[in-house]
From Swiss-Prot:
Transmembrane segments: none annotated. The lineage of its organism: Bacteria, Pseudomonadati, Pseudomonadota, Betaproteobacteria, Burkholderiales. Keywords: DNA-directed RNA polymerase, Nucleotidyltransferase, Transcription, Transferase. PROSITE patterns: RNA_POL_BETA. Belongs to the RNA polymerase beta chain family. It catalyses: RNA(n) + a ribonucleoside 5'-triphosphate = RNA(n+1) + diphosphate. InterPro entries: DNA-dir_RNA_pol_bsu_ext_1_sf, DNA-dir_RNA_pol_bsu_external_1, DNA-dir_RNA_pol_su2, DNA-dir_RNAP_su2_dom, DNA-dir_RNAP_su2_hyb_sf, RNA_pol_bsu_bac, RNA_pol_bsu_CS, RNA_pol_bsu_protrusion. SUPFAM superfamilies: beta and beta-prime subunits of DNA dependent RNA-polymerase. One of its GO terms (biological process) is DNA-templated transcription. Pfam families: RNA_pol_Rpb2_1, RNA_pol_Rpb2_2, RNA_pol_Rpb2_3, RNA_pol_Rpb2_45, RNA_pol_Rpb2_6, RNA_pol_Rpb2_7. The keyword rRNA processing does not apply. This is DNA-directed RNA polymerase subunit beta.
Length: 1370
């Protein structure tokens, strides 16, 4: 395998026993593919498929006027280039979007010469019409909406189609199963069928009033006879003078108890009365040639007639279909000479008379009456005219405009009906409705199975593209209505398409969806992992989905079909548990939106490299072996029985039965869970916490790679988009802290493209969670890079690998109760070395508005401000970048006009003379909040169009232009250097006809001549060969074109920066100040490992007091050993052991480098390390210099990868510990023979502890729950308007509620005065509060409690109920 640029610097030793069969797919594929398909921006308009925007337009158009003589047709749409790029949209608070312009044609037909079949065109108008702005997805799979980064979460909803279920016996007290069916379309009315406890079958539309199902069957054109014929088989009777004969059908008799003697045709009794008919009896009857059995008269009573029986002579209907036979009716039939009497066959077991009894309860007579009944149910109170009745019924299920089953729905429907084809009409057909009722009746009869609604074959994912398309369709539907109304005017008035179409409904629908929908979420940007996880999230909530309150246990639980599709571990704790899930590592979506997972195909027991993606429905048909099944060297499954899965059950199967095999053991978990090493040794609940808390890790100042990882770290870092990767290979030409310039390889540079890539790095950018996004280059000038190599590290990455925390030396021991209840004891050295220091960036905004009293002004001229405070503000009144500020400091000076008090003429005169301004404005400057401090790192000034910019705003624009010009100059320099190289190659050795420095005709050009001539004069050389001259001219034109394009780009940038900014209504100027705050680790901060082992820092101990080893190394963190056994997360112990080995091996490599060991010796040691156990590495690829550089990077600890479910065994860890700590190291460090524990010494006394302690290195994280953000205190502050009680919460600068239980505590102690103080002057006694202030000022300490305001509120509420209540003084 070839190593990337960063892998060559540091290879992660992998303990996986199985080589990767399938690369982990791009982790943001689902989001990106879905939105690309929605926009189809790069597809030629004529080649676009009917999905996304194209489908929405095709569904809405053509629009035809009410009279049919004007028609608007859609041709194609185009997406404009966005006005601002992502970064500009973020700073300006805009939406990163592209304008959609649709080309439409307006056809006006000639009224006189047109017929309904053949319309004559009178006029055609074509125009491009603006159809709103569609937000664009960034390269990282997010959206910028109003300047903030948002993610559209995919929704897991019930797939359209037909579902059969029962109520699990919960409805009726007898526990009887009531079966039901539901046809769910993508768009349109739901159709439900359900049995009631009495076995009548009903239907309902959109959960309205239920009606007998036979009404619907009649409404679709069936009559009584055809209904019975569809659901029942017939028992044919032949009427005799006395009794009758029944046609003999063996399987109907078998198992029945004979109600009379059954005889064969010879009269011999085969089955005696009251005996059960067996297979032997029916065989005897068949052998005797019996075709009819004689039955007594009473056997016919209660039977149901299968069809209308008509008197052939008179045409009179003697018995109607579904009529029960009575003695009188049989007599009447005999008299009329009827012989053949078909009756429906029913029995108690598997052929119930449900449809027949439902039909009897139905009073409608024919198709129209049935449709009228449906109309009355849908539109109660409206008169049912014939047209209205027929139109409503058609619109319910048969009109494509109002009913859409969708491709998925039709596929699912046909599959359930057992039809071979997966396509068909997108509306319901009569056959569909009939087929559903038949299956439902079969279910009630005990044939077939109900559906499992939690099966992933019945739930599909709606992605960004589909959700956005639905919103766009909504907007277009509103436009369609409006256009239809106005199309009639286009005949009389000369209107163009843009006069008819108003794009506001589309813009409003999209804005509402992207800005306020439950599925459009503020991106979790705490660290790269939280970004990736947020984009891979699948939610069952949201519009059209479930609600938290109504979701039961079943829908939240792990289902067998989640295997390889949805992670069984990662889900939030709390009310959303199980409703919000994460996509598994290898999962993808198929065309229908169902989640698929990959499997290797197995043929005759041999595992092939062919990979098939199976959905949950398909998976149930196969036998699938696990990824850890043992294979021989030829890839054949070994062993007689292999653990496999079939139809959701775990079985043991022979190798020949196995059809597929998992691709990887990590296939079942998500990205976050697959980053937990030794996951297989952790309890599921703790693994869930570990995966969730990894997403809350704060990016640290100096990220450090985890010594014990899983091998997914690199993929996660690259796919998250946090690191910068090379889009094309090439050589690094220039590097500094803010940008990297790469000269692209000749073979990768396309003709006409600039052969230079410039990567501007992000510096101190604020994330959504106020953490710091910062990129650092890791390449050097002259390095050769391939496409995809990491150029710069981002937040929480180290050499292109995810690094969320720090590797800490952990000791598992108790320490004076400071690690009681999961508290964490930390060494002062950790804080001193800035190991957990993080930078947080706050954005503070101030706006100058146009008020009724005049304009607010941002200025340095602020009343009553000390010179010391003003020193930090520039002449525009804005603080300098780099200033360190404390709470209360002024950041931006702003004054607001005060209401003018009426002035005397003398005062007006004095004011006019002396220009005294300060008295009529008040200071409303932006100041630093209480509890925050930091350094100003950036200032942005935005000015409305038409308002003069101040000097600070102009300076910011100039700096930005300077930076941009620098980039262009770099590009130009490299392009020109490249061009001159090509010219030199072209001209050297060629004959010239003349040139600069009086070059003689016929002279051969050499390098010395070219060096002596200035490069720009090379174009003046006149080569003798015409093709060489032409090439020279072409290079010259190309260079001039590049220069011109750069000048245009610079002008465009200048125009963008100098034009006025879009600001909210009434705002003249806006200033944003960014504060960077350094947060050191302190007691109260929450920390956690990756195994759900969380805790709060209790004490920071001086390094000299920490427990230390025999060689003097002190522990960094001391954890409570009681946190391990009951929590059952043993993974942390194994991680500590392997981390201990990693550190020891690193130290050994460091010692070898210090002793200047030979490269061969280093290679030998590295070979023993990397190729002793686990996956083999090809170290021969690395040059000697690369080996030395890599060894240097390994000295702080060798990175290990222990993939989930395929990780390091105890033996592997033991082998690594042996390699790390030879015998002399054991003595030196005071280790036990197993090398897993050490004898520690008490730092305060120097005495050894009695027993050895487990020590080692663990990757420990600092979480985003920082004590600085939670700490809060209030003296006085805002009060609630009604109750006059202090507000609550830190954001409102609120107080602590002294609640009911606290009152009880004071009552229990009898502390009456303290209690009175709490409930009155310290809460809502307004007069009392004022008096307390006065007494404090006077130096007295007495309180005078009055009436609490909340009591007055209570009195007012009682009065509002009409109860007169008066207070009397006691």
């Amino acid at each position: 395998m070839a190593y990337s640029y960063t892998e060559r610097k540091r290879i992660r030793k992998n303990f996986g026993s199985r080589d990767s069969v399938l690369e982990i797919p791009y982790l943001l594929q689902m989001q990106k593919d879905a939105y690309t398909a929605f926009l189809q921006a790069d597809v030629h308009p004529k080649k676009r498929t009917a999905e996304g925007l194209q489908a929405a337009f095709e569904a809405a158009f053509p629009i035809i006027s009410h009279n049919g003589f004007v028609e608007m047709k859609y041709l194609e749409y185009n997406l404009a280039k966005p006005a601002f790029d992502v970064r500009e949209c973020q700073t300006r608070g805009l939406t990163f979007a592209s304008a959609v312009r649709a080309k439409v044609q307006l056809f006006i037909y000639d009224r006189e010469s047109s017929t309904s079949q053949n319309k004559v065109i009178k006029e055609v108008k074509e125009q491009e019409v603006y159809m709103g702005e569609v937000p664009l997805m960034t390269t990282k799979g997010s959206f910028i909406i109003n300047g903030t980064e948002r993610v559209i979460v995919s929704q897991l909803h019930r797939s359209p189609g037909v579902f059969f279920e029962h109520d699990k016996g919960k409805t009726h007290s007898s526990g009887k199963l009531l079966f039901s069916a539901r046809i769910i379309p993508y768009r349109g009315s739901w159709l439900d069928f359900e049995f009631d406890p009495k076995d009548f079958l009903y239907f309902r539309v959109d959960r309205r009033r239920k009606m007998p199902v036979t009404i619907l069957l009649k409404a679709i054109g069936l009559n009584h006879e055809s209904i019975l014929a569809n659901f029942f088989v017939n028992d044919n009777f032949r009427l005799m003078d006395s009794g009758a004969q029944m046609e003999f059908v063996a399987e109907r008799l078998r198992g029945e108890v004979a109600r009379f003697d059954i005889t064969d045709k010879s009269g011999k009794v085969i089955v005696a009365k009251e005996k059960r008919v067996t297979a032997r009896h029916t065989r005897e009857l068949e052998q005797s040639g019996t075709t009819h059995i004689s039955v007594p008269e009473d056997f016919l009573l209660g039977r149901v007639v299968a069809r209308n029986i008509v008197d052939t002579d008179t045409g009179e209907i003697l018995a109607k279909a579904n009529e029960e036979l009575t003695e009188a009716l049989i007599k009447k039939l005999r008299l009329a000479g009827v012989q053949d009497l078909p009756c429906i066959y029913t029995n108690e077991l598997d052929q119930g008379a449900y449809i027949s009894q439902t039909l009897r309860s139905d009073e409608t007579v024919d198709e129209f009456a049935a449709r009228v009944a449906i109309y009355r149910m849908m539109r109660p109170g409206e008169p049912p005219t014939e047209d209205a009745v027929q139109a409503l019924f058609q619109r319910l299920f048969y009109n494509p405009d109002t009913y859409d089953l969708s491709r998925v729905g039709r596929m699912k429907f046909n599959a359930k009906m057992g039809r071979p084809e997966s396509t068909g009409p997108m509306v319901l057909t009569n056959e569909d409705i009939l087929a559903v009722v038949k299956i439902l009746v079969d279910l009630r009869n005990g044939r077939g199975d109900v559906d499992d609604i939690d099966h992933l074959g019945n739930r599909r994912v709606r992605c960004v593209g589909e959700l956005a398309e639905n919103q766009y369709r909504t907007g277009l539907a509103r436009i369609e209505k409006a256009v239809k109304e106005r199309l009639g005017q286009a005949e009389q008035e000369p209107l163009m398409p843009h006069d008819l179409i108003n794009s506001k409904p589309i813009s409003a629908a999209l804005k509402e969806f992207f800005g306020a929908s439950q599925l459009s979420q503020f991106m979790d940007q705490t660290n790269p992992l939280s970004e990736i996880t947020h984009k891979r999230r699948v939610s069952a909530l949201g519009p059209g989905g479930l609600t938290r309150e109504r979701a039961g246990f079943e829908v939240r639980d792990v289902h067998v079909t989640h295997y390889g599709r949805v992670c069984p571990i990662e889900t939030p704790e709390g009310p959303n548990i199980g409703l919000i899930n994460s996509l598994a590592l290898y999962a993808r979506l198929n065309d229908y939106g169902f989640i698929e997972t990959p499997y290797r195909r197995v043929v005759d027991g041999k595992v092939t490299m062919e990979i098939d993606y199976l959905s949950a429905i398909e998976e149930g048909k196969f036998v699938i072996a696990q990824a850890n099944a043992v294979l021989d060297k030829d890839g054949k499954l070994t062993g007689e029985m292999i653990s496999a899965r079939e139809a959701g059950e775990t079985i043991f199967a022979g190798p020949e039965r196995v059809q597929y095999m998992d691709v990887s053991p990590a296939q079942i978990v998500s990205v976050a869970a697959s980053l937990v090493p030794f996951l297989e040794h952790d309890d599921a609940n703790r693994a869930l916490m570990g995966a969730n808390m990894s997403r809350q890790a704060v990016p640290i100042l100096r990220p450090e790679k985890p010594m014990v990882g899983t091998g997914i770290e690199r993929v996660a870092a690259i796919d998250s988009g946090t690191v910068v990767t090379a889009t094309r290979g090439g050589m690094v030409d220039y590097v500094d802290a803010t940008r990297v310039v790469i000269r692209v390889n000749d073979d990768e540079a396309q003709a006409g493209e600039v052969g230079v890539d410039i990567y501007n790095l992000i510096k101190y950018q604020r994330s959504n969670q106020n953490t710091n996004i910062h990129q650092r280059p890791i390449v050097k000038k002259g390095d050769m890079l391939a496409k995809g190599d990491v150029i710069a590290d981002g937040a929480s990455t180290d050499l292109g690998e995810l690094a969320l925390g720090q590797n800490m030396l952990i000791g598992f021991m108790t320490w004076n109760g400071y690690n009681f209840e999961d508290s964490i004891l930390i060494s002062e050295r950790v804080v001193a070395d800035d190991r957990y220091t993080s930078i947080h960036i706050e954005e503070l905004v101030v706006m100058a508005r146009d008020t009724k009293l005049g304009c607010e002004e941002i200025t340095r001229d602020i009343p009553n401000l000390s010179e010391q405070q003003l020193n930090r503000l520039d002449e525009s009144g804005i603080i300098y970048v780099g200033a360190e500020v404390q709470p209360g400091d002024t950041l931006v000076g702003k004054v607001t006009p005060k209401g003018e008090t009426t002035l005397t003429p003398e005062e007006k005169l004095l004011r006019a003379i002396f220009g005294e301004k300060a008295s009529d404005v008040k200071d409303t400057s932006l100041r630093v909040d209480q509890g925050s401090q930091g350094t100003v790192i950036d200032v942005q000034v935005f000015t409305r169009e038409g308002i003069v910019r101040d000097r600070r705003a102009q300076q910011i624009i100039d700096d930005e232009l300077k930076r941009f010009r620098l980039d262009l100059n770099d590009q130009l320099r490299l392009v020109e250097a490249d061009s001159f190289d090509r010219i030199e190659k072209l001209l050297v050795g060629k004959v010239a006809n003349g040139g600069p420095q009086k070059l003689a005709k016929g002279t051969t050009i050499d390098k010395a001549y070219l060096t002596s001539v200035e490069k720009h004069h090379w174009f003046d050389i006149r080569p003798a060969e015409d093709d060489v001259a032409a090439q020279l001219e072409s290079i010259k034109n190309s260079m001039e074109q590049t220069r011109h394009s750069f000048d245009l780009a610079f002008e465009e940038k200048r125009k963008k920066l100098t034009q006025g900014d879009e600001l909210p209504a009434g705002v003249l100027k806006m200033v944003k100040v960014y504060l960077a705050v350094k947060r050191h680790l302190q007691p109260g901060d929450k920390m956690a490992g990756r195994h759900g082992n969380k805790g709060v820092v209790s004490k920071i101990v001086p390094v000299e007091d920490m427990p230390f080893m025999a060689d003097g190394t002190p522990c960094d963190i001391v954890l409570n050993p009681l946190g391990v056994p009951s929590r059952m997360n043993i993974g942390q112990v194994l991680e500590v052991h392997l981390g201990w080995a990693a550190k020891g091996i690193g130290q050994r490599i460091g010692d070898m480098l210090q002793a200047e060991a030979k490269v061969a010796e280093l290679r030998k040691f590295l070979d023993e390390l990397y190729n002793g156990t686990g996956r083999k590495e090809d170290l021969a690829q690395l040059s000697d210099d690369e080996v030395l550089e890599m060894a240097g990077n390994l000295t702080s600890g060798v990175p290990f990868a222990t993939p989930v479910f395929d990780g390091a065994s105890e033996a592997d860890i033991g082998a690594m510990l042996k390699l790390a700590y030879p015998e002399d190291a054991i003595r030196q460090k005071g280790l036990t023979p197993a090398r897993t524990q050490a004898y520690l010494y008490d730092g305060r006394t120097g005495d050894p502890f009695e027993r050895p302690t487990t020590i080692g290195y663990m990757h420990y994280l600092k979480l985003h729950h920082l004590v600085d953000d939670k700490m809060h205190a209030r003296s006085t502050g805002p009060y609630s308007l009604v109750t006059q009680q202090p507000l609550g919460g830190k954001a409102q600068f609120g107080g602590q509620r002294f609640g009911e239980m606290e009152v009880w505590a004071l009552e229990a102690y009898g502390a009456a005065y303290t209690l009175q103080e709490m409930l009155t002057v310290k809460s809502d006694d307004v007069q009392g509060r004022t008096k307390v202030y006065e007494s404090i000022v006077k130096g007295e300490h007495s309180i005078e409690a009055g009436m609490p305001e909340s009591f007055n509120v209570l009195v007012k509420e009682i009065r509002s109920l009409g109860i007169d209540i008066e207070l009397e003084r006691g």
